[in-house]
Amino acid sequence: MLVKTFGSALTGIDATTICVEVNISVGINFFLVGLPDNAVKESLHRISAAFETNGFKMPGRKITVNLSPADLRKEGSAYDLPIALGILGASEQISAELLDKFVIMGELSLDGTVRPIKGALPIAIQARKEGFRGLILPAENAREAAVVDTLEVYGVNTLAEVIDFLNGEKNLSRTEVDTRQDFFDKSTRFDIDFNEVKGQSHVKRALEIAAAGGHNVMALRFLFTGSILIPLLHYS
């Protein structure tokens, strides 16, 4: 049986959606193709252990996993989760109905815990462009991805949570972010401000430029009133 899940590959700040094709047929052995690096190749061992600790079985037949497009290098351990779910779906151990509706990423630990990934925001942006219903990601990455509106973003902590959701046994809490409210909540107010320093416009301008560009400033000597106040304001 052939099942498709979807992940994503990062190239700099750009994401490319990856189709994870899993086919189970007569025979033995596990084949992972599609230009995977060593971390991706090691996924079999993490997935097998996660299955065992969560009451599932690695099919005793020939398993072929293709990461498409095959000419793009696949790096990292974040493909563990989509590969694992593809294997479970292809072996009919879970429902495969929702697998192609979401972009799914996450590293699996041996006990089935889902570990964080990198690049949740560009992955979410690309998923929205391609019309996916949403994303299933590690809980630590959910808020970052949820900044992209119109997507259903679900943060998960374990493999079992994802399986229960796909089987319709339990609902996941959708992560939503109000970016406007977050901005105001994180706005910082200070008791003092540059407008309380009279004159010294050239010094204030230099410090503003340094702060905007993230440059270091060395204050050698200030021979005027406010000599302590100005460096303090810049530090704030």
Task: Describe each PLM feature range.
Residues M1-L220, S227-L232:
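Peripheral, non-AAA+ core regions of ATP-driven protein-machinery
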Residues Y235-S236:
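Post-Walker A helix-loop "phosphate-sensing" segment adjacent to the P-loop in P-loop NTPases
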